[in-house]
Structure formats: C-alpha cells, structure tokens
Amino acid sequence: MTLGQQAESLAQGYLEQQGLTFVERNVRYPFGEIDLVMRHKKHWVFVEVKYRSANQFGGAIQALSKAQIGRIRMAASHYLQTHKLDVPCRFDVVAIEDAQIHWLVDAF
C-alpha cells in the first residue's frame, strides 16, 4: 500500500468516526480525480486527502493548487451528472501532517 493509499484509508476511517458514510474511493476521470466520496446527512461530500510527513515545504493544505481545485470540481460535477444526483454537495479537505489529522469542512 502506497503512502497516498494509507493516508486515504486513515482519512476515511477518521471521517467515518465523525459520522460520514463512505461511498467510493479514487474516482478517476481523464480531467480529474476524487480521493473519497462520502455522504454526510443530505450532502454528498467530495474529499481531497493531502499528506505531508513534515511541513518544511509548506503544509498539506498549501499543497492544494487552484488548478487542482478546478479539476476536483469538474470531476465532482461529472460524478453527480453520471450518477443522476441532484443533491447538495460540498468539498472537504483532510490534511494529514506528522500523524495529525486536520479536517476542513467546505474547504472550497
């Protein structure tokens, strides 16, 4: 299991402990990827997981670029369309730094 997969598993477990329900992992489209798809009450939650072992090059949150946010939004829109979902959604980020988990709800 790669570090990215380990971080996604850790994030998924953490979010499930917080009351979210797991739907799908690593949804890939030619134009973008969604790390985790979760549900929280009536919302579908698209989660980007960022891992950094140390923040010497900036923390996990700083690793998320505007271009990457655009690709995630496009992938989420496509996901909702292909699954015929007309539901509220949000974009969360789970940042894992030095074994600490930071969950940013509605991050972008």
Swiss-Prot record:
Alphabetical list of Gene3D superfamilies matching this protein: 3.40.1350.10
Pfam families noted in UniProt: UPF0102 (PF02021)
Xref: InterPro entries: Restrct_endonuc-II-like, tRNA_endonuc-like_dom_sf, UPF0102_YraN-like
Gene Ontology molecular-function annotations: nucleic acid binding
Family: Belongs to the UPF0102 family.
NCBIfam families xref list: PRK12497.1-3 (NF009150), YraN family protein (TIGR00252)
Protein name per Swiss-Prot or TrEMBL: UPF0102 protein Shewmr7_0260
Organism: Shewanella sp. (strain MR-7)
Phylogenetic placement of the source organism: Bacteria, Pseudomonadati, Pseudomonadota, Gammaproteobacteria, Alteromonadales
